[in-house]
Swiss-Prot record:
The record marks 527-528, 535-536 as: Cleavage. Changing residue 699 to R: Decreases Notch signaling pathway. This is Delta-like protein 1. Ubiquitinated by MIB (MIB1 or MIB2), leading to its endocytosis and subsequent degradation. Ubiquitinated; promotes recycling back to the plasma membrane and confers a strong affinity for NOTCH1. Multi-ubiquitination of Lys-613 by MIB1 promotes both cis and trans-interaction with NOTCH1, as well as activation of Notch signaling. Ubiquitinated by NEURL1B. Phosphorylated in a membrane association-dependent manner. Phosphorylation at Ser-696 requires the presence of Ser-693, whereas phosphorylation at Thr-638 and Ser-693 occurs independently of the other sites. Phosphorylation is required for full ligand activity in vitro and affects surface presentation, ectodomain shedding, and endocytosis. Transmembrane ligand protein of NOTCH1, NOTCH2 and NOTCH3 receptors that binds the extracellular domain (ECD) of Notch receptor in a cis and trans fashion manner. Following transinteraction, ligand cells produce mechanical force that depends of a clathrin-mediated endocytosis, requiring ligand ubiquitination, EPN1 interaction, and actin polymerisation; these events promote Notch receptor extracellular domain (NECD) transendocytosis and triggers Notch signaling through induction of cleavage, hyperphosphorylation, and nuclear accumulation of the intracellular domain of Notch receptors (NICD). Residues 1-17 form the signal peptide.
Length: 722
């Protein structure tokens, strides 16, 4: 099992070597002859089920570097191989795969380095009893051994050889061929044809790169540009094109780009504008020799350059215009008189006079007023120099008043008025809003003061507009603005216009001038509220005394009801209170209080004036320590002395000593001695011999202090403010 694993590992190694190899040494075993079937030690091959001396032959091949004295021992530096059993005694081996699919003839030894040109070869023929046992370490299995060293050049041709040892003959052949894409004497030149971004080439016989048409460079990655493309200013990404770099243009990128806007200039480098002769300025757009370049003057006029891009033309007689392009029409001012016809000449004019007239402009007449030349009632007068003049009546013209005039032809009427020709005069029928002889005046539509209620009138064509004061609207400001227009009533109320006022008809449950208040008890029907003048934006009307009185009565009734409820509650509370205990016939009083009353409720703390809340109300000091104990109140009319703090903790002590105090109150005289309690709530008093320390005073100067006695005080003493 271990040998099979070793064989599989060797095959995988050989395959990996083939992947990365540059060439392959190939050994072809052709024929092996073992005439007597003997081993190398002349013993007969035994074992197995075949005939005696039948040697089941397999081969071990070892390829190593060139050695002058070849050693058959490992390592096989170039590779080794062990074949399966290929035959018995004498046999021939065909090319390709044999009986055993694990063997292929020739045996291949891939190389991952340059072929050195020399090698040493060891071929051992071995015998095995079992096809599964292909161990080569046992020398007893050896049939024959071939050791040789050779020089070998790379090529496709096989080198034939025959090894004879006397008892055995081995005929074999070998060669070294380069792997695909490898070339050269040692298969060290790598060349793989490609046509992509990394190259465009094929490979020659010796592995040289032969660029595809249109490509050049060491790896054929540089395209050959269009023939004539400038080497510096042009480039290409693929063969046959010529792309220009920035600032250059043209088919071959040999033309510089001029400065933008340059008209009559050239450049030697990009963005230049070198003006041509006769041109100036930043953009070479100012013609310094306009007359020569443009020849603007026509009709034989003389051109004179007057500056950059300017000129003047001196026209010949009979021509005018900036470039003398206009021929002067000498007949334009109608120089011919008396109905003569004018003919324009190149530099003058000619008048063709009607019968009876002569002169350059036919100004002279051969007729007189005696001949009656004037028509249509024209008045004739003789001229001192000869001839006559006809004074035409209105509506006629011409030298002899022979032409009837169109009085409306000159459009004398303005502002779209229609002109009516009356023969001797005309009449303008004006459009609405205009007046005057020629309808030139706009009729003042505000003259009649159409705007009412102090509105301002603005006149327009056959119309007017009024700017109304607040409270009015309409064409003439005659319509008052509706007070309900802006929806003053709230909560679904209905607005009613009442002249200059409005009224809100409130929905059930709402009230107020604008129905903005929610009523606690809505009236049974809808409420109509007449707004006061403060809400109506106008003054006038009586003050609503009835509503005010009704409101006051409602408030008083409410207060009386509350007072009655309070009195009832207090009466019920007094009924549930226990009756006060009698003082046992004690008649001695102090500050209108009996001794028993003074004895009770003396267990209070000393509180400074700064700790008393002044509320300007009557203070109610009430102590309730049980049903068996009566209560009393000390009233201070202006100060509320809050003495509730920490009184509950002393209730038990007060209950225990209550009966003892009552007895004491009855037997004690008014001049009895005071016994000081050992402790006070205001603080500990370590010395019992200082009775005056029981009554402490506050240092507060704003208010007087309340003297507080301990609950354990024996005498019936009450503290008060003096």
């Amino acid at each position: 099992m271990g040998r099979r694993s070793a064989l599989a590992l060797a095959v995988v190694s050989a395959l990996l070597c083939q992947v990365w190899s540059s060439g392959v040494f190939e050994l072809k075993l052709q024929e092996f002859v073992n005439k007597k079937g003997l081993l190398g030690n002349r013993n007969c091959c035994r074992g197995g089920s075949g005939p005696p001396c039948a040697c089941r032959t397999f081969f071990r091949v070892c390829l190593k570097h060139y050695q002058a004295s070849v050693s058959p021992e490992p390592p096989c530096t170039y590779g080794s191989a062990v074949t399966p059993v290929l035959g018995v005694d004498s046999f021939s081996l065909p090319d390709g795969a044999g009986i055993d699919p694990a063997f292929s003839n020739p045996i291949r030894f891939p190389f991952g380095f340059t072929w050195p040109g020399t090698f040493s070869l060891i071929i051992e023929a071995l015998h095995t009893d079992s096809p599964d046992d292909l161990a080569t370490e046992n020398p007893e299995r050896l049939i024959s051994r071939l050791t040789t060293q050779r020089h070998l050049t790379v090529g496709e041709e096989w080198s034939q050889d025959l090894h004879s040892s006397g008892r055995t003959d081995l005929r074999y052949s070998y060669r070294f061929v380069c792997d695909e894409h490898y070339y050269g004497e040692g298969c060290s030149v790598f060349c793989r044809p490609r046509d992509d971004a990394f190259g465009h080439f094929t490979c020659g016989d010796r592995g040289e790169k032969m660029c595809d048409p249109g490509w050049k460079g060491q790896y054929c990655t540089d395209p050959i540009c269009l023939p004539g493309c400038d080497d510096q200013h042009g480039y290409c990404d693929k063969p046959g094109e010529c792309k220009c770099r920035v600032g250059w243009q043209g088919r071959y990128c040999d033309e510089c780009i001029r400065y933008p806007g340059c008209l009559h200039g050239t450049c030697q480098q990009p963005w230049q504008c070198n003006c041509q002769e006769g041109w100036g300025g930043l953009f070479c757009n100012q013609d310094l020799n306009y007359c020569t370049h443009h020849k603007p003057c026509r009709n034989g006029a003389t051109c004179t350059n007057t500056g950059q891009g300017s000129y003047t033309c001196s026209c010949r007689p009979g021509y005018t215009g900036a470039n003398c392009e206009l021929e002067v029409d000498e007949c334009a001012p109608s120089p011919c008189k008396n109905g003569a016809s004018c003919t324009d000449l190149e530099d003058s004019f000619s008048c063709t006079c009607p019968p009876g007239f002569y002169g350059k402009v036919c100004e002279l007449s051969a007729m007189t007023c005696a001949d009656g030349p004037c028509f249509n009632g024209g008045r004739c007068s003789d001229n001192p120099d000869g001839g006559y003049t006809c004074h035409c009546p209105l509506g006629f013209s011409g030298f002899n008043c022979e032409k009837k005039m169109d009085l409306c032809g000159s459009s004398p009427c303005s502002n779209g008025a229609k002109c009516v020709d009356l023969g001797n005069s005309y009449l303008c029928r004006c459009q609405a809003g205009f007046s005057g002889r020629y309808c030139e005046d706009n009729v003042d539509d505000c003259a009649s003061s159409p705007c009412a209620n102090g509105g301002t009138c603005r006149d327009s064509v056959n119309d007017f507009s009024c700017t109304c004061p607040p409270g009015y609207t309409g064409k003439n400001c005659s319509a008052p603005v509706s007070r309900c227009e802006h929806a003053p009533c709230h909560n679904g109320a209905t607005c009613h216009q009442r002249g200059q006022r409005y009224m809100c008809e409130c929905a059930q449950g709402y009230g107020g001038p604008n129905c903005q208040f929610l009523l606690p008890e809505p009236p049974p029907g809808p409420m109509v509220v007449d707004l006061s003048e403060r809400h109506m934006e106008s003054q006038g009307g009586p003050f609503p005394w009835v509503a005010v009185c009704a409101g006051v009565v409602l408030v008083l009734l409410l207060l009386l009801g509350c007072a009655a409820v309070v009195v009832c509650v207090r009466l019920k509370l007094q009924k549930h209170q226990p009756p006060p205990e009698p003082c046992g016939g004690e008649t001695e009083t102090m500050n209108n209080l009996a001794n028993c009353q003074r004895e009770k409720d003396v267990s209070v703390s000393i509180i400074g004036a700064t700790q008393i809340k002044n509320t300007n109300k009557k203070a109610d000091f009430h102590g309730d320590h049980g049903a068996e104990k009566s209560s009393f109140k000390v009233r201070y009319p202006t100060v509320d002395y809050n003495l509730v703090r920490d009184l509950k903790g002393d209730e038990a002590t007060v209950r225990d000593t209550h009966s003892k105090r009552d007895t004491k109150c009855q037997s004690q005289s008014s001049a009895g001695e005071e016994k000081i309690a050992p402790t006070l709530r205001g603080g500990e008093i370590p010395d019992r011999k200082r009775p005056e320390s029981v009554y402490s005073t506050s240092k507060d100067t704003k208010y007087q202090s309340v003297y507080v006695l301990s609950a354990e005080k024996d005498e019936c003493v009450i503290a008060t403010e003096v």
